Amino acid sequence: MEKMNVKPAEGKLGILVVGCGAVATTFMTGVFMTRKGLAKPVGSMTQYDKIRVGKGADKKYLHYKDIVPLADLNDIVFGTWDVYPQNAYQAAMYAEVLKEKDINPVREELEKVVPMKAAFDKNYAKRLDGDNVKDCKTRWEMVEALRQDIRDFKEKNGCARIVVIWAASTEIYVPVDMEIHGTLAALEAAMKADDRQHVAPSMCYAYAALTEGAPFIMGAPNTTVDIPAMWELAEKTKMPIAGKDFKTGQALVKSGFAPIIGTRCLGLNGWFSTNILGNRDGLVLDEPANFHTKEVSKLSTLETILKPEAQPDLYGHGNDEDTQYYHKVRINYYPPRNDNKEGWDNIDIFGWMGYPMQIKINFLCRDSILAAPLLLDLTLLSDLAARAGRFGIQRFLSFFLKAPMHDYTKGEEPVNHLYQQYTMLKNAIREMGGYEADEEID
């Protein structure tokens, strides 16, 4: 296979993180500590995973960086926006995800990461009360201010390239309105008209990033780039976009475990998932309007893996909700746990002759510890995609995301099956490295 024309990863890579909370500071601290040889980036596919290339006697297993030109960790420069003014060191200490002994060796580096004023609308995250916000009269002013931030950061830090990733709170749910979100022209008109109902602040970040030549990744379940207008902008600017919602704990388990049920042709009566979480993310999600955005994302995982219309005897009849399996997701704000999220899953299945069985999963995880490597992989791979000339929705990044983006206007279904997603990821790396894609995904 002819090798793709992938530009080398030369110069500094600026990673601008929207949000300087638990996830962002855990990510930054880990990168800084790894650069000093004081920690290992465990959980990062780009740093640890190996992909088979070639077949038979010619096969070999290589790290991603030995197949494609990835940015080096030493070339990363961090920037951030946040509604709170504390620098990354102060924010990391406040979050209490990491121990002081794992933060203090890179205190100097973290203290240099000072949040720029955020483009913020309290109506989209009512539980947040920070005052480090831009004084913008309209959504279009937000866009212009954010574009200037990106230009200034790039120039000040001598960055060759920029990637923008959202690690801020979940916004209230914004349903897709094709009159506003259907075309780029309509979205721009809404921004200039200050349509605050249909244009979320996150859309201003995405618009600013793409127009400044930076890939944009949506790490929350926000609608943001999951609209035709943003797909059009990504195509116009030739920039990659990815989303939605980092796949960390319960959704990771679900996307990996549901295929076991489906592959074994077992039936499903119901799947009940509940979580407790005490960090700032949990606080925001305690607001019903914000939780609904997350609920839509978390509920989407099962329906494309265990399809009622494909196996009505096992998963119910597609047009009759009364016969489909019952799927419920809940998140409860519980401050004593802070970032240490706990998830419970009760799965009611049935087997031979319809006899019932149950599966119980109890996952005591650390939300930011699971999320941090996703930020690293998504930013490095989005930068790679841009240098490879890939633009628009990056489906190969579905592996890292809870509600993978897809062109729903054409009836396309997302791939939520973890092992199919992994094959998509590997094949994209192979192709960008000049190797053949050689594994089936269905």
What are the residue ranges of the model-derived segments?
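Metallocofactor- and cofactor-centric catalytic cores in central/energy metabolism, strongly enriched
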Residues: M1-A220, T224-K236, Q250-A258, P356-D442
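Short glycine/serine/threonine/alanine-rich loop segments
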Residues: G213-A214, M239, C265-L266
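Short flexible/disordered coil segments
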Residues: N222-T237, I276-E287, T304-D313, Y334-G343, ...
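Conserved anion/nucleotide-ligand pocket segment
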Residues: A242-K244, T248-N319
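Glycine-rich, aromatic-lined ligand/substrate-binding cores of catalytic
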Residues: T293, S297-I393
